[in-house]
Amino acid sequence: MRHQYVYAVFPRAYSKSFLSMMVLMIRCILYPKCKLFVTSGGKEQAAGIMKEKVQEICTLIPAFKKEIDWTRGVTLEGKDYCKYVFHSGSYFDNIVARETSRGKRRHGGVIEECATVDGTILSEVIIPTMNVSRLCMDGSTHPEEQLNKSQLYITTAGWKNTFPYDKLIQLLVWQIIKPEKSMVIGGTYRIPVLVKLLDKNFVRDLKMDGTFNEASF
């Protein structure tokens, strides 16, 4: 929330998608008329993540549900497209990591499972959608606002010599140069096991499974 660029690497069951959707919802409430997005390697994947996590958040915290305009035709929940419109005039939806998304305008967003997103499309299509800063309620713009151009990269472990790895190193360097804007965070499977989101016996079985790829966990 307090950083413009965040790169988060966590294992399965760490609630990374849950928390990233909550971040978007909070920003939509606090920043009127902002336009945010979620993208991933597949269109249906992003829509599925959004729908599942938003419904879960609204069930656990009903106050969030009251902030969303559930009028028919306003908030949309489909198989390959979801859009959540808030009473503040803000919204977030999913956009496709393809050439067809060129020309769209958003103020910030989440790149889910960024290890599977094409680096060229991300650099030439997705990131340029954030060229325009949010217009405040008084008609002014504040380019220095943390919301503008905000990029939250979420993924499980990936591989070296790839675009996501290069982006991770870039943000790690920025964290040293400008710590107020950039942050790189990560975690292990021990936290999900500790809070009972992940069964330790299941993790132990995976470790002993010779056919399981550890990098995919």
Q: Can you describe what each PLM-predicted range is?
A:
Residues M1-F217:
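Phosphate/NTP-binding elements of NTP-utilizing enzymes
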